[in-house]
From Swiss-Prot:
Pfam families in the record: Zot
Bilayer topology annotation: Single-pass membrane protein
Transmembrane parts of this sequence: 187-207
SUPFAM superfamilies in alphabetical order: P-loop containing nucleoside triphosphate hydrolases (SSF52540)
Domain of life: Viruses
GO cellular component terms, A-Z: host cell membrane; membrane
Name of the protein in question: Putative assembly protein ORF301
Keyword Cell membrane belongs to the record: no
C-alpha cells in the first residue's frame, strides 16, 4: 500500500511513522527510511533498519520504505509538467504490490508530492495538533484529500483523537515535538473564570445560609432555656393571649364615708349603700382626716 502522511511541522508526523516502523520491525520486515535522528538501538530488530535509497526499487521485496520530507528535489516533488510520467520510480509504483513493498511518504501538504503518487495513494493520514497538546486529531481517507483542513472533507474522513505514544519519544530526536507547550484558548480561560466565580458565589451563599440557620437555632435554644418573667411569677405565657384576666381576689368597692370612735378606738367605712367595708384601721382614720370626696377602693365584708 502507498500511504501519505501530512501535517504541519510539530504535529506528530514523524512520531506516527515511528510507530509504523517499530510494528514492521517487530514482524521481522526490513525497513528503510531517511528519517534523521533515529536511535536504532531502541527499535526491535535494529539490524533490519537501514537508510532509504532515493530509488525504492533498490530495496528487497517485502520491505517497508518510509520517505520523510518526500517533496525534496532528489525524491518525489510536485511539478507542473503535463503529459506522460517519465520517472521510472514513479511508474513502477503502479505495480509495487507485486513485490510486497509498502511505501510511506511524509510531507506538509498533499500537493507537495508528485501528482502520480497522489493518484496511487490508498491511505491518506492527516494530523492536526492544537495548542501544543500531547495529542493530535487524525483524519483518514482511502484516497488523497487535497484539502485535508477543509471542514467538509474532514466530515467525510474517519476521525480519531490520537494520543502521542510517549514510549516512542526516545526512538528519535525532535527539536519541535517536545518544545511545544499547551496553550489554553482564551474562550476556555474566560469560561473557567466564570465557572470558578459562580462556584465561589454558590459556596458563599451556602455558607451564609448555614450560618444564619445556626444562629437561629442557637437563639431558639437560648429562648427555650430562659424562663419568662411571667412564668417566674406563676403566670403562663399562653394566658397573655386570653381576652380577659380572672382573679380570685374580692371585687374592689368605692368608700363613701368613714366614722371613728376615739373612746373605743374603732373606725369603720361604708359604701354608698351603707354596707360596712373591710378596711385597715389606719386607712380608715386617713380617710376621716383627709378631705372628701375621694375614692378609696376596699372589699366589702
Amino acid at each position: 500500500m502507498i500511504t501519505l502522511i501530512t501535517a504541519v511541522p510539530g504535529s506528530g508526523k514523524t512520531l506516527y511513522a515511528i510507530g509504523l516502523i517499530e510494528a514492521a520491525l517487530s514482524e521481522g520486515r526490513p525497513v528503510f527510511t531517511n528519517i534523521s535522528g533515529l536511535v536504532k538501538d531502541k527499535f526491535s530488530n535494529p539490524h533490519l533498519l537501514s537508510d532509504a535509497p532515493d530509488d525504492w526499487r533498490d530495496t528487497p521485496e517485502g520491505s517497508l520504505v518510509v520517505y520523510d520530507e518526500a517533496q525534496q528535489a532528489h525524491l518525489y516533488p510536485s511539478n507542473a509538467q503535463r503529459g506522460p510520467v517519465t520517472d521510472e520510480r514513479l511508474t513502477a509504483m503502479e505495480t509495487h504490490r507485486h513485490t510486497g513493498h509498502d511505501l510511506v511518504f511524509i510531507t506538509q501538504a498533499p500537493t507537495f508530492v508528485h501528482h502520480h503518487i497522489r493518484k496511487l495513494v490508498g491511505l491518506h493520514i492527516h494530523l492536526y495538533r492544537s495548542r501544543g497538546l500531547q495529542a493530535a486529531s487524525k483524519y483518514e481517507w482511502s484516497h488523497v484529500c487535497d484539502s485535508p483542513n477543509d471542514r467538509k472533507e474532514q466530515q467525510r474522513a474517519d476521525f480519531v483523537l490520537w494520543k502521542f505514544p510517549k514510549e516512542h519519544f526516545a526512538f528519535y530526536t525532535s527539536a519541535v515535538m517536545h518544545t511545544h507547550k499547551f496553550k489554553m484558548p482564551k474562550k476556555i480561560g474566560v469560561l473557567l473564570v466564570f465557572v470558578v466565580l459562580g462556584l465561589g458565589a454558590v459556596g458563599f451563599n451556602l455558607y451564609k445560609n448555614s450560618g444564619l440557620a445556626s444562629m437561629a437555632e442557637a437563639t431558639a435554644s437560648v429562648a427555650e432555656a430562659t424562663p419568662s418573667p411571667l412564668a417566674l411569677n406563676g403566670v403562663k405565657p399562653s394566658s397573655l393571649a386570653a381576652p380577659y384576666q380572672w382573679s380570685a381576689a374580692a371585687p374592689a368597692v368605692p368608700v363613701s364615708g368613714c366614722v371613728a370612735n376615739r373612746s373605743t378606738n374603732r373606725c369603720q367605712c361604708f359604701d354608698a349603700s351603707g354596707v360596712v367595708l373591710a378596711i385597715e384601721h389606719a386607712a380608715c382614720l386617713s380617710v376621716i382626716s383627709s378631705p372628701l370626696p375621694r375614692q378609696l377602693l376596699s372589699t366589702s365584708k
